[in-house]
């Protein structure tokens, strides 16, 4: 019975507890807000899903955080959850089963994350899910069972991913699908049954993919035509002839496959192995692939993964946990700075973990927990500054531990105790502090001599650089004299090092010394997040703080005692800003912009003793200003604007001993009467605060004023502490709504309440968005319409996280900076209507996730490809009502932003500089006279003028001589007393007021013999008649003298009174007998013969069968009979023809002989080709002659022998012959002539015993005589022509110094060996050798590569986009036959074009005349072009070498520094230097007939890289000095 009673009691207690649990409200997760069944945790920077989410939650908002991983326990038990928001996180991994408990889930948003893949059967338990958003991730493939179980999905969004593969049947379960978006992916093919089972599909997007329209995609065309309202703008991207065609418009016969292809379902290899990696034998190799994160699609059976030499920074939670069989992980040489504590959880088989060469500073707690099999752990070359005492507690089998080259100063005792199997340890290159806390390590290393790297002490000085294992343990001591690095904190930090409390890292931009953290003078506007916990003094003075926010930062600083906020711009302190700062006893807020003081500002400062509020803008001290500051002893309010102090203002300051109220404009009226008596009683005030009002009490100490004189008579009843002053005088206020419309305001009025929610500033004269607006965090509406705002900044609306409505319409906005609207995640309405905006940069609205209405009409939008994103953005949820229209370019004018197809937004040529200048006004070069242009938020742009000029555009000289009014080198002098007066002293040869007149020196000249005088500058020149010469034309010429005789072709020169005449030889005419008279003009050739001119005669070339001097004899009549060719056998494809009754063979290129039986010329087109001549052909005395043609610089021509050899090759365009008869080094000779010009050259080689003779084109021979020893040349070896085999026994040439060993590339013909013409058909021939010679000359193929051919001489392999025999015709050029009348054709794509009209013409075909005013018509630029400034003003942009308003002045000779690649042609390849070369270009003019040119240059060697993959080193001549020198014709 007793047992039954206890059972009943236990059952009753269980029921009671269950009921209490059901009734009691569940706790809300920390930082989140809960209302009913809704839990809101958005925008909290969470890195993981919070714990303890109430089980009854129906809606969970986790968007806008930093979550990286979803585990299968995160949402366990949430069986009532219907809506889950996970967008805008950093999720890269979702464990299988993560959503298995979410049986009621209806909507799931995972868009804007980092997902690359997701596991199959992920949604198996979510049968009620009807909306799933996976857009804007990095998903690469869709597995076959991706959506298995989620049969009720109606809306599935997969757009803007990287999907390239969809496994067959992936969508088979989604029979009720209504909306499917697959646009903007990398899809190339889809299986035929992909969408057939979706009868309810009403929205389907597939555009912006890489669809390949071959026979396997023909089904999609029919499918789309049957459903004309879905799949709009779906286009082919291949093959090339269908690129850009709508799939639905392509006919079935056009979907063709090349060859016999059979469709194979897309093989989604990326699902089983990362795209950048290789997978085999359970090993995944991702070394050096540029990865930035751990791949998620790894095979579950892997045993080893290699991730070294990438740029991975973070190891997320559970990164390797799914791969239970892992034995080795290599993460070395990355940039890892963050490791999740459970990154390696569950890897019980892991025996090697390599983490060296990263940026790890701390090992998280439990990082190596459960790694019982680990034997090798490499942590060297990191920045580890602390080891927890239990860091290695489970590593019982570890053999080798490397902590070499880190930042360890101490190690807690017991850290290495669990390492029972340790054999080797590396601790060197750490800054160890060898005090008493490290004594244990010395004892440990004495007992276990396993440290092999030589770990040494860094401090104290007496132990510096000594090996820890060799120091006696008694030397490790702590004393008051030995405090290192941070005085007073060493011992404290060392003791806690086992818990990694010694947070040594100093915040970025700050300086840490002792317990002081100095972050002053760094332009900070927020308190750094990671401040060391040992901080006692925090210096934040001289920064850019405007509001002190309640971030809870001081809760983490238990040692903090002093904070310095002086010299900032602080206007407000949020309630709770100092929460947790209970130990702080001194705060400096001197020189800020505080206007009032409230007790909530200082909440949490229970121990504060000193409060400095000097030099602020405080106007009132209320009786609640200092509540809670009972410990304050010193309070300074010096130099503020205090006029009133409320009675009892200092009563709560029980410990106050010093109060400074000096330098304040106190109004001694009735409201201040109490203060005089209080000052007399307390006697704690520094100095004597004085009255400033009323006038009769000015400068009277307050404590000396009689009580009856503190009156509010004569209207002096101002009270700065009155609550009525909470509304500016220019505005009207109702609750939290402030209206300041149409008040002519230029700055924000003072006194706007901090809790204002709606602020109306429309109809004023603001030119900028007031910076002070960022202080009003509760604003939900701002109206700044109808002002003069011309620019916005990236900080214009910072801190306005609650803003719902922003109206900026009817201003002068020209540019939207990319980050102007960052942080406005609650904004629902944005009005930019009626401005001058042309372009909105992509990403400008990224944070406007809640925006439902955008007004951007009445703006001159320039709708090219840079605005396509905005069109897509407004179309996505119809956020723009269809008012905004495009103003250009071209055909886009007047098109609606909302309805115009995205493909119409294209870029066609350069954008007008006036449009670009809206966001960068300096592009239009508005600053004249070398002024420097800078953007300015108020004046749009501002010019910094050089000396001598002023004005907005630096176009106004400060005095008359600045603009050099004296021409032609005249000297300008100012007239005293006249601002614009000047006079000129002219250079010789000029006169006039501005030296503009060149004196006519021909008025008194000495030119003789009727010569013509030509005026110069201070001189003149005589132009002589033909028969005279000399400076003054005083000498008569003898034209018939031998050195002057102009008569050509042996004609006779005869002197005449007027000069000379030529008596021509027969056949020549002309003044100088230089013209060969065309005797064919009156020829007697008959029967269609061709006349060929000759000197003093002509020749008739007769048609076939005709003969005679004038081809007058007809061919004899031939009776039908058998052709002579019938029995004449032409060889090698030659054609037999009959000529004069005789059969003749017309040989193909390369062949000759009576029957074309010999192959005598060949073309080497392969770098590995060669001919092999039998050894019997070559004897000790041999004469070899051949003809070659090439434009290459190098290549083997002839080679015979093994180690001792005769070799003839091309070397830098010359013929190089070497003869190695056994002496070393081998002798060599070079031809004087270069032969790589593409023409044929004769090379003759004569070998006689131990001498070798070389001759080119019949020139003087070069001879080698090598008599050092008897020749060992092997005459039994063959003779190789044009190359040689790459075997070791004939590789001496390839290895010889100065020789390249590459095969010949070009033509060889008429090879004679000992006067015997060689037939190449009879010798072994490699592939890549063609009969006939037609060498490829440079640039014969305009846009392609020349390849020799035996049939046509050569063929051109054209580049993409070009066609024709010489690659000089464009393919699919829509501009061929265009109809542009007064304009230029610009191709849009392969099928259409647009016309860019000339000035004064318009219309689609530029066939309409326009009468447009062009400001550039008013000025003429002599040596330059007219441009428009940012304000629309015309100016001249001068060509190089000229200056002046009209570009009419030539700049004197000077060298202009340029830095660019140096280019040259090398054979068939274009080559350029591997780096840019700095050199001078000489520009400008010179006087005295000289030219501007180089005076000094130098030669330097540079490396060149060529388009064919080759490289070489060559010299380049660089100009280093320019000046005036003799002109070179």
Swiss-Prot record:
Residues 1453-1528 form the CTCK domain. LRR repeats lie at residues 56-77, 80-101, 104-125, 128-149, 152-173, 176-197, 301-322, 325-346, 349-370, 373-394, 397-418, 534-555, 559-580, 583-604, 607-628, 631-652, 755-777, 778-799, 802-823, 826-847. Residues 209-259, 430-480, 664-714, 859-909 form the LRRCT domain. The record marks 1121-1122 as: Cleavage. Residues 31-55, 264-300, 497-533, 718-754 form the LRRNT domain. Residues 918-955, 957-996, 998-1034, 1036-1074, 1076-1112, 1121-1157, 1332-1368 form the EGF-like domain. Keywords: Chemotaxis, Developmental protein, Differentiation, Disulfide bond, EGF-like domain, Glycoprotein, Heparin-binding, Leucine-rich repeat, Neurogenesis, Repeat, Secreted, Signal. One of its GO terms (molecular function) is calcium ion binding. PROSITE patterns: ASX_HYDROXYL, CTCK_1, CTCK_2, EGF_1, EGF_2, EGF_3, EGF_CA, LAM_G_DOMAIN. It is found in: Secreted. It holds the Pfam family EGF. SMART domains: CT, EGF, EGF_CA, FOLN, LamG, LRR_SD22, LRR_TYP, LRRCT. Residues 1-30 form the signal peptide. Residues 1160-1333 form the Laminin G-like domain. GO terms for biological process: aortic valve morphogenesis; apoptotic process involved in luteolysis; axon extension involved in axon guidance; axon guidance; branching morphogenesis of an epithelial tube; cell migration involved in sprouting angiogenesis; cellular response to heparin; cellular response to hormone stimulus. Transmembrane segments: none annotated. Coiled coil: none annotated. GO terms for cellular component: cytoplasm; extracellular exosome; extracellular region; extracellular space; membrane. Glycans are attached at residues 66, 186, 564, 623, 794, 799, 1009-1010, 1019, 1183, 1266, 1300. Fetal lung and kidney, and adult spinal cord. Weak expression in adult adrenal gland, thyroid, trachea and other tissues examined. Interacts with GREM1. Homodimer. Binds ROBO1 and ROBO2 with high affinity. Thought to act as molecular guidance cue in cellular migration, and function appears to be mediated by interaction with roundabout homolog receptors. During neural development involved in axonal navigation at the ventral midline of the neural tube and projection of axons to different regions. SLIT1 and SLIT2 seem to be essential for midline guidance in the forebrain by acting as repulsive signal preventing inappropriate midline crossing by axons projecting from the olfactory bulb. This is Slit homolog 2 protein. It comes from Homo sapiens (Human). The lineage of its organism: Eukaryota, Metazoa, Chordata, Craniata, Vertebrata. The gene is SLIT2.
């Amino acid at each position: 019975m007793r047992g039954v009673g206890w059972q009943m009691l236990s059952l009753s207690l269980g029921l009671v507890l269950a009921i209490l649990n059901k009734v009691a409200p569940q706790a809300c997760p920390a930082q989140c807000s809960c209302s009913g069944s809704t839990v809101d945790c958005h925008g909290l920077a969470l890195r993981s899903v919070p714990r303890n989410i109430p089980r009854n939650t129906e809606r969970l908002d986790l968007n806008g955080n930093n979550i990286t991983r979803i585990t299968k326990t995160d949402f366990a038990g949430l069986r009532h959850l219907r809506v889950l928001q996970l967008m805008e996180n950093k999720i890269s991994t979702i464990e299988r089963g993560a959503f298995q408990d979410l049986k009621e889930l209806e909507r799931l948003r995972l868009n804007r994350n980092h997902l690359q893949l997701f596991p199959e059967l992920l949604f198996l338990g979510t049968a009620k899910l009807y909306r799933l958003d996976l857009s804007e991730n990095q998903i690469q493939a869709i597995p076959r069972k991706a959506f298995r179980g989620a049969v009720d999905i109606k809306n599935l969004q997969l757009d803007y991913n990287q999907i390239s593969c969809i496994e067959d049947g992936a969508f088979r379960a989604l029979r009720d699908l209504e909306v499917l978006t697959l646009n903007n992916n990398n899809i190339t093919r889809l299986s035929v049954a992909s969408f057939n089972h979706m009868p309810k599909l009403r929205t389907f997007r597939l555009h912006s993919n890489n669809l390949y329209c071959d026979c396997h995609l023909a089904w999609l065309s029919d499918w789309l035509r049957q459903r004309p309202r879905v799949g709009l703008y779906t286009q082919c991207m291949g093959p090339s002839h269908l690129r850009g065609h709508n799939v639905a418009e392509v006919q079935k016969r056009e979907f063709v496959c090349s060859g016999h292809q059979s469709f194979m379902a897309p093989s989604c290899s990326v699902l089983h192995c990362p795209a950048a990696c290789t997978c085999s034998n359970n090993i995944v190799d991702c070394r050096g692939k540029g990865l930035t994160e751990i791949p998620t699609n790894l095979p579950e059976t892997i045993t080893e993964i290699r991730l070294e030499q990438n740029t991975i920074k973070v190891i997320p939670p559970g990164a390797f946990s799914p791969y239970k069989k892992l034995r080795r992980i290599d993460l070395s040489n990355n940039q890892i700075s963050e490791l999740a504590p459970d990154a390696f959880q569950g890897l019980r088989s892991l025996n090697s973990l390599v983490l060296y060469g990263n940026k790890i500073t701390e090992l998280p707690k439990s990082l190596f927990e459960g790694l019982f099999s680990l034997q090798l752990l490499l942590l060297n070359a990191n920045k580890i500054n602390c080891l927890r005492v239990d860091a290695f507690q489970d590593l019982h089998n570890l053999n080798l531990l490397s902590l070499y080259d880190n930042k360890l100063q101490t190690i807690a005792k017991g850290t290495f105790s669990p390492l029972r199997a340790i054999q080797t340890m590396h601790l060197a290159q750490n800054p160890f502090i060898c005090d008493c806390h490290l004594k244990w390590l010395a004892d440990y290393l004495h007992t276990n001599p396993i440290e092999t790297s030589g770990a040494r002490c860094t401090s104290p000085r007496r132990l510096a650089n000594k090996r820890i294992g060799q120091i006696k343990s008694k030397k490790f001591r702590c004393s008051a004299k030995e405090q290192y690095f941070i005085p007073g904190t060493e011992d404290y930090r060392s003791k806690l090092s086992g818990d990694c409390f010694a947070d040594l890292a100093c915040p970025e931009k700050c300086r840490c010394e002792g317990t002081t953290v100095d972050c002053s003078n760094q332009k900070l506007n927020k308190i750094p997040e990671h401040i060391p916990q040992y901080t006692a003094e925090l210096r934040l003075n001289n920064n850019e703080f405007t509001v002190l926010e309640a971030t809870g930062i001081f809760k983490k600083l238990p040692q903090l005692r002093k904070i310095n906020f002086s010299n900032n711009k602080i206007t407000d302190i949020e309630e709770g800003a100092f929460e947790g700062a209970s130990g702080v006893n001194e705060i400096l807020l001197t020189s800020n912009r505080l206007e009032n003081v409230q007790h909530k500002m200082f909440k949490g400062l229970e121990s504060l003793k000193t409060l400095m509020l000097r030099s602020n803008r405080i106007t009132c001290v209320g009786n609640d200003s200092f509540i809670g500051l009972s410990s304050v002893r010193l309070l300074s309010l010096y130099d503020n604007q205090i006029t009133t102090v409320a009675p009892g203002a200092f009563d709560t300051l029980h410990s106050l001993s010093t109060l400074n109220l000096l330098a304040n404009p106190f109004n001694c009226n009735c409201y201040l009467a109490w203060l005089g008596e209080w000052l007399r009683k307390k006697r704690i005030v520094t100095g004597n605060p004085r009255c400033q009002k009323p006038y009769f009490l000015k400068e009277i100490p307050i404590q000396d004023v009689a009580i009856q004189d503190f009156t509010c008579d004569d209207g002096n009843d101002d009270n700065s502490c009155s609550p009525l002053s909470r509304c500016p005088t220019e505005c009207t206020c109702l609750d939290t709504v402030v209206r300041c419309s149409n008040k002519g305001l230029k700055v924000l009025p003072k006194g706007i309440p901090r809790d204002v929610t709606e602020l109306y500033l429309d109809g004023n004269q603001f030119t900028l968005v007031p910076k002070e607006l960022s202080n009003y965090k509760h604003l939900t509406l701002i109206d700044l319409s109808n002002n003069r705002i011309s620019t916005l900044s990236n900080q214009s609306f910072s801190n306005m996280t609650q803003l719902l409505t922003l109206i900026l319409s009817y201003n002068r906005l020209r540019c939207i900076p990319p980050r102007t609207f960052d942080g406005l995640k609650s904004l629902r309405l944005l009005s930019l209507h009626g401005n001058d905006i042309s372009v909105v940069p992509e990403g400008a609205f990224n944070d406007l996730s809640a925006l439902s209405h955008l007004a951007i009409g009445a703006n001159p939008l320039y709708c090219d490809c840079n605005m396509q994103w905005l069109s897509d953005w407004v179309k996505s949820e119809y956020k723009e009502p269809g008012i905004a229209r495009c103003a250009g370019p071209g055909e886009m004018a007047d098109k609606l932003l909302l309805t115009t197809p995205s493909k119409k937004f294209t870029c066609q040529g350069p954008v007008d500089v006036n449009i670009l200048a809206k966001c960068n006004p300096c592009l239009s070069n508005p600053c004249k006279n070398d002024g420097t242009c800078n953007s300015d938020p108020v004046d749009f742009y501002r010019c910094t003028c050089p000396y001598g000029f002023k004005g907005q555009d630096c176009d106004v000289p400060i005095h008359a001589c600045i603009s050099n009014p004296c021409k032609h080198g005249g000297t300008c002098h100012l007239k005293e007393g006249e601002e614009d007066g000047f006079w000129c002293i002219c250079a010789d040869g000029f006169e006039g007021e501005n030296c503009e007149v060149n004196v006519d020196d021909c008025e008194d000249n000495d030119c003789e013999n009727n010569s013509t005088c030509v005026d110069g500058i201070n001189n003149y020149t005589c132009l002589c008649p033909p028969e005279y010469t000399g400076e003054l034309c005083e000498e008569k010429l003898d034209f018939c003298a031998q050195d002057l005789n102009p008569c050509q072709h042996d004609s006779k020169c005869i002197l005449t009174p007027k000069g000379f005449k030529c008596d021509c030889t027969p056949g020549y005419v002309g003044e100088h007998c230089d013209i060969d008279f065309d005797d064919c003009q009156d020829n007697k050739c008959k029967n269609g013969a061709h006349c060929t001119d000759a000197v003093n005669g002509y020749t008739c070339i007769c048609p076939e069968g005709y003969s005679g001097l004038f081809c007058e004899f007809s061919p004899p009549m031939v009776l039908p009979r058998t052709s002579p060719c019938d029995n004449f056998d032409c060889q090698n494809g030659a054609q037999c023809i009959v000529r004069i009754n005789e059969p003749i063979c017309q040989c193909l290129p390369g062949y000759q002989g009576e029957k074309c039986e010999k192959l005598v010329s060949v073309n080497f087109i392969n770098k590995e080709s060669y001919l092999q001549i039998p050894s019997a052909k070559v004897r000790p005395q041999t004469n070899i002659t051949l003809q070659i043609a090439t434009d290459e610089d190098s290549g083997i021509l002839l080679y015979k022998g093994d180690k001792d050899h005769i070799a003839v090759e091309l070397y830098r365009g010359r013929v190089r012959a070497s003869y190695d008869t056994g002496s070393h080094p081998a002798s060599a000779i070079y031809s004087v002539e270069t032969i790589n010009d593409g023409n044929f050259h004769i090379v003759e080689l004569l070998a006689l015993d131990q001498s070798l003779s070389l001759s080119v084109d019949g020139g003087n021979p070069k001879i080698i005589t090598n008599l050092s020893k008897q020749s060992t040349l092997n005459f039994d070896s063959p003779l190789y022509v044009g190359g040689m085999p790459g075997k070791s026994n004939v590789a001496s040439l390839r290895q010889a110094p100065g020789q390249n060993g590459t095969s010949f590339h070009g033509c060889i013909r008429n090879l004679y060996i000992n006067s015997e013409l060689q037939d190449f058909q009879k010798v072994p021939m490699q592939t890549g050798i063609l009969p006939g010679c037609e060498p490829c000359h440079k640039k014969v193929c305009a846009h392609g590569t020349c390849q020799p051919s035996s049939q046509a001489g050569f063929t051109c392999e054209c580049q993409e986009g070009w066609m024709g025999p010489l690659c000089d015709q464009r393919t699919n050029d829509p501009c061929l036959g265009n109809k542009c009348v007064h304009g230029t054709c610009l191709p849009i794509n392969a099928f259409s074009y647009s016309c860019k009209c000339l000035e004064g013409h318009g219309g689609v075909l530029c066939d309409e005349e326009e009468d447009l005013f062009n400001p550039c018509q008013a000025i003429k630029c002599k040596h330059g072009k007219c441009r428009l400034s940012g304000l629309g003003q015309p100016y001249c942009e001068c060509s190089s070498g000229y200056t002046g308003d009209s570009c009419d002045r030539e700049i004197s000779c000077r060298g202009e520094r340029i830095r660019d690649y140096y280019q040259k042609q090398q054979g068939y390849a274009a080559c350029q230097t591997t780096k840019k070369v700095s050199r001078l270009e000489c520009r400008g003019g010179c006087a005295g007939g000289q030219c501007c040119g180089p005076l000094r240059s130098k030669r330097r060697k540079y490396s060149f890289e060529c388009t064919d993959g080759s490289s070489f080193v060559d010299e380049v001549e660089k100009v280093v000095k320019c000046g005036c020198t003799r002109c070179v014709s």
